[in-house]
Design a protein with these regions (language model features):
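Cell-envelope/extracellular polymer assembly enzymes that use nucleotide-activated donors
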Residues: 3-5, 30
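Conserved sequence signature across two-component system core domains
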Residues: 10-11, 34-36, 58
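Short, well-formed alpha-helical segments that are part of the catalytic scaffolds
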Residues: 11-27
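Acidic helix N-cap motif at the loop->helix transition within catalytic regions
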Residues: 15-19, 40-48, 95
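Conserved donor nucleotide-binding strand/loop of the catalytic core
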Residues: 32, 43-78
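Acceptor/aglycone-binding surface of glycosyltransferases and processive sugar-polymer synthases
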Residues: 60-74, 82, 94-171
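Short beta-strand-to-loop acidic/aromatic patch adjacent to the donor-nucleotide binding site
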Residues: 80-91
Length: 171
C-alpha cells in the first residue's frame, strides 16, 4: 500500500509558504516542510501554523538539492513510500496533487514530473530560454519529450532513490 507525503523545500518564502501549505492540506495531510536556512520570517510562520506538519530546519542555506534529500530522508524515516515535491513560491497548483496520485496508480514505481505554464507572460525571459534549452537537451539525450524538465513539482518513489549518487546539493 502506498503511503504518500508532500515535501515542500523552502528558502525565504515568507510571503507564500502559509498559502502553499493551506492549499496542499486540501489534498494531503502528510506534509514535510524543509526550511533551508531561511533568513526572513519563514521559520516563524511555520511555527505558527497549527496543523500537524513536520518541519525540518537548519540554520544555513545548503541549497534546494540538500533540502530535497533531507525531506526524502525524513519521509523514509516516517514510513512513506512516495513523496510529491512542490515549490514553496506558489508557482505550482496543489489541486494537481490528485493527478499525481492517479498517475501513481498506473505506474507504482514511476517518477512523475508536473508541468508549469511556461508562457513568457508567466516567467522571466531568461528563465523561459533556460527551460526551453533544458527541455531540448533532455529530448536530444533521451528521445523523451518533456515540456518542463526543470519543474519542482514531482512524484518520487522513495525506494528508487536508494544509492543515488548526487554530485551537488545546490541547484
Amino acid at each position: 500500500m502506498e503511503k504518500i507525503c508532500v515535501i515542500i523545500p523552502t528558502y525565504n518564502n515568507a510571503t507564500t509558504i502559509r498559502r502553499v501549505i493551506e492549499d496542499v492540506e486540501k489534498y494531503c495531510s502528510s506534509i514535510i516542510v524543509v526550511n533551508d536556512g531561511s533568513t526572513d520570517d519563514t521559520a516563524a510562520i511555520l511555527q505558527s501554523i497549527p496543523s500537524p506538519i513536520e518541519v525540518v530546519s537548519y540554520p544555513d542555506n545548503r541549497g534546494k538539492g540538500y533540502a530535497l534529500v533531507t525531506g526524502f530522508k525524513k519521509a523514509k524515516a516516517l514510513g512513506y513510500t512516495h513523496a510529491i515535491t512542490i515549490d514553496a513560491d506558489g508557482q505550482h497548483f496543489a489541486d494537481d496533487i490528485p493527478c499525481f496520485i492517479e498517475g501513481l496508480k498506473h505506474n507504482p514505481e514511476g517518477f512523475i514530473v508536473g508541468c508549469r505554464n511556461l508562457t513568457e507572460e508567466n516567467m522571466p525571459r531568461q528563465n523561459t530560454f533556460a527551460n526551453r534549452f533544458s527541455n531540448f537537451w533532455f529530448r536530444l539525450q533521451t528521445g523523451i519529450n518533456l515540456p518542463d524538465t526543470q519543474s519542482g513539482y514531482r512524484l518520487y518513489t522513495l525506494s528508487s532513490l536508494k544509492g543515488l549518487n548526487l554530485i551537488t546539493s545546490r541547484y
